[in-house]
Amino acid sequence: MPADFVGLSYEVQQLANPDFFSLKNSGLIRQFRDLAPLGVLRLGGNTSEFATWKQSANAPDPERPNTREVAGEPRAQYYAVTPEAVRNLAGFLHATGWRCIYGIGMGTNTPQRAAAEAEFAAHTLGASLEYFQLGNEVDLFGRHLRDPQTWNAQTYLDEWLAMARAITARVPAARFGMPDVASNIEWLTEIANRWASIPNPPRVVTLTHHYYFGGPATNPAVNIPNLLKPETMAKVQKTADTANTDAKKMGVRVRMTEGNTCYRGGKPGLSDVFAAALWAADYSLLLASNNYTGVNLHGGTGNSVANSVGGSLPGDALLKEQGETPQQIASHPHPFYTPIATFGSEYLLEPVGYGLKFAGALSGSTFVAEDLTAKLQAAGVNATAYAVKLAGGHRSVVVVNKDATKDVDVTLDFGPKTTGAAAVQTLRAPALESREAHIATGPAAHVHNGKVTVTIPHASAMRVTLA
């Protein structure tokens, strides 16, 4: 599990306000640093396809291609990304200790403009640049940005190669992640199968995909029981197996670069409550145990995410139908799934962010084989377990008890020579539906004959660590 496994994903449109990712935004800097000392900020999202690189104030606007307006997809609202925004981003990254996956649109862009932006970004961000991402959810371009009759993984790859080669010509050390699909993992397979036949390909270091449990907010099947049931993570495991097989063919690893509980901005009562914290902890650790380089949970400001999905959040309409007043609606985080919420000038870590933080505490560790998850689920408890060896040599086990009613007693065997006490950390809230989450240190657990017995209450997670 890399030391910078923890990640957040934001819309590129956040750069339209150069002060957002800047040294001026001390509140957001504090939240990033508190979430993880090392991490990866990914800039992308649907709005990246309508960003225009504006090298200077008097640079003319480029010609705009025709696009289609489709429900759930962004309107063609163009905006500028400026050198000031990128310079400020560099300061923000330096202050947080994080690195950046820098997204450049493909949908309405040209290789020449992309190369100019990439050259400036690479020079300005320096060591803070993780790699470039070209295009966002390219498997959905046929809906509004390309001819659905001809758009597929092969035509995408042809366009991607032209853009990536233009960038590499100006940034010889450029690295890339691809293809950043929304859900069609088969595209990874098609790309991996073709990759060996591509002469002198650009340097790809990561295969990337997105993941949302379901959506939109109006879908009744998007609920807490379905979010937390074992079958949900079984599907995640299947995707990870496919992605890892494809990555191995290309000699790279995999990253989940954008995802969360419910697409199109999240669902109130699901995305902004403690159930999302348990989901985030379990989801992150499952992918970490599958050799992923990281997880980037999507969020940001309500306006940027609303713009990315057509101008409004379905969750707001749902709350209005349920009778909430404008003041009550405003009390929810916007978007509902954001790990770090914006309330006026304040930034608050939301439950889903606490889940990511809890899992991220294991960053830098090595996973070890264990069969505790199978034993727990065979006993009829909806729980998962992950065992690691920390960077300093300590051993740690995390149990995520997603069961709504059953507490679980677990005996952890660390070997007969182990003595002393084990440190305990918990992730808890009053209920799955609570709009809060807490990470706390519990009483030390006694080690007897190398074994530690602990009780993990229902709807909570626990980490037990031995020196």
Please state what every model-predicted region is:
Residues 378-418, 424-427, 459-462:
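Carbohydrate-binding surface patches
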Residues 416-460:
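Acidic, Ser/Thr/Pro-rich beta/coil linker or hinge segments at domain junctions
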Residues 8, 41, 132, 137, ...:
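Conserved, mostly hydrophobic/aromatic
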Residues 38-60, 211-217, 297, 302-306, ...:
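Short, solvent-exposed beta-strand-terminating loops
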Residues 14-19, 50-52, 217-218, 431-436, ...:
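Short, solvent-exposed loop/turn elements at domain surfaces
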Residues 256, 261-384:
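Aromatic/acidic polysaccharide-binding cleft in carbohydrate-active enzymes
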Residues 1-194:
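N-terminal catalytic cores of secreted or lumenal carbohydrate-active enzymes
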Residues 102, 111-113, 117-119, 152-283, ...:
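Noncatalytic carbohydrate-binding groove/subsite architecture in carbohydrate-active enzymes
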